[in-house]
Amino acid sequence: MSKESIFDCIEQRRSTRFYSADTLSLEELSYLLWATQGITGMNKNGLTLRTVPCSGATHTFETYLMIMRLEGIRQGIYRYLSVEHQLLFMFELDELEQKIDAITLDQPFVPNFARKASVLFAWSTTPYRSEWKYDISAHKKILIDVGHVCQNLYLASESIGAGACAIGIYDQKLIDEILALDGDEEFVIYLGAVGKKRE
């Protein structure tokens, strides 16, 4: 798995909405998951240290994946278990690509682009994990922190010849229902599509 220099990744980073038919490998997905929510150590209080900064090490996010095309992995909905660095298969979803069109509101500037990616990352947040410490300020911190996560997805994708595109406009109710989130205590806050770049 070749990796570009950090300088090149930052300079070449663009939102990518056109993907090739090539699939991501499991090794590449593993790398992207590590880059966005991977654990790099523990502090003296037993809190996880990760590849992204997070206010007070509260880590309010969970990573769900809608996998369309990935080498050696069946299509479906998965959850990333960061402590174990493992994927948990949740369930298959009938008409997954059509559901992704509906979730992403069939973005008019590039129709159906998300369904053509290899994988759609969906980050959920459980605000209370930060609210107990920061009260109402937690909401601002959560929004900043999810930006760190998605930027790492962009840079890590770039480093392996893939491209990412963040998606901030989506059908909130539908995606929360699909992932069996209550939409109150836990809800999706950001999406990111990733696929191999088209030449």
Q: Over which residues does each language-model region extend?
A:
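Short proline/glycine-enriched turn/loop segments at secondary-structure junctions
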Residues: E177-D184
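N-terminal amphipathic, basic helical "cap/leader" segment at the start of enzyme domains
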Residues: M1-K116
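Small-aliphatic-rich amphipathic alpha-helix that forms the alpha element of a beta-alpha
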Residues: L32, T63, F121-R129, A138-E177
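C-terminal helix-cap and adjacent tail motif
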Residues: L88, E92, F187-E199
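Short histidine-centered catalytic/ligand-binding loop motif
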Residues: R14-T23, W132-L143, I160
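A mid-sequence, solvent-exposed acidic-amphipathic segment
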Residues: D94-V146
